Amino acid sequence: MADPNLSPLWTSQEAAKATDGQALGTWAINGVSIDTRSLKPGDLFVALKDVRDGHEFVANAFAAGAEAALVSRDVLGGHPGLMVHDVLHGLEKLGLAARERNSGVISAVTGSVGKTSVKEMLARIFRAAGRAHWSDKSFNNHWGVPLTLARMPRETERAIFEIGMNTPGEIAP
């Protein structure tokens, strides 16, 4: 459940501006999800293409309580959404905008071994010191980092990210 003391995570206008997308309807979301099984009511469902195409799950997302969906083709069935050319690129832009709007201390852990353990230790310390945000699980790849950024409340005072890479140049500034 969203903290009532926090602003909405994203409004339709903010998300459209951040992604250069087209907002369909007026909405405000409290979370961002890529999985209908863990989606919470009020979330933005991001229809990423991976082994399966997330567009196939948009109807399930709305049935689970999604407030809107980030899509690249109209599968919204009249529900609110955000239309972009490429969903992953839209998520990346949302993550960049979240970083730009935040003035808190942002840290990252990289390396070959121990990233998750160090990130969890630092997250525990940060939580004790105020409003903190951190990577869920080991979401440290090309979609996990922008997802974690896009989920970061604007009121975050300290954040810790886990960043991994598979190929040279994959980690962007």
Task: Locate predicted features.
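N-terminal leader/targeting and accessory segments in enzymes
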Residues: 1-93, 97
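Phosphate-binding loop of NTP-binding sites
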Residues: 14, 91-173
